[in-house]
Amino acid sequence: MADAWGWEYDPDSDFVIGGIDNLAFVAKVEERADELVRAASALYLGGTKYDGISPLMQEESIDASGLFVYQVIPRHQRVCIRRVIFFAA
């Protein structure tokens, strides 16, 4: 279990963002993930002691470029990015 809040690609980056070659878009996803981590750490102050139900998966748009699906898991102090979709021009 982690000592501090963070985010990760779940199950791994190859599965979640593999094939997306637009590095600027990926950087925007990761920047937004950092913001979600800060928000989750403030919302779930108990972190590892949280005993409620984990929030459902949510969707976050990145400009008109694409979106990603994520889930906050308070007990593991993680924001898990499950899927990234890039709308190729």
Which residues make up each language-model segment?
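Basic, Lys/Arg-enriched alpha-helical interface segments
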Residues: M1-L67, V72-A89
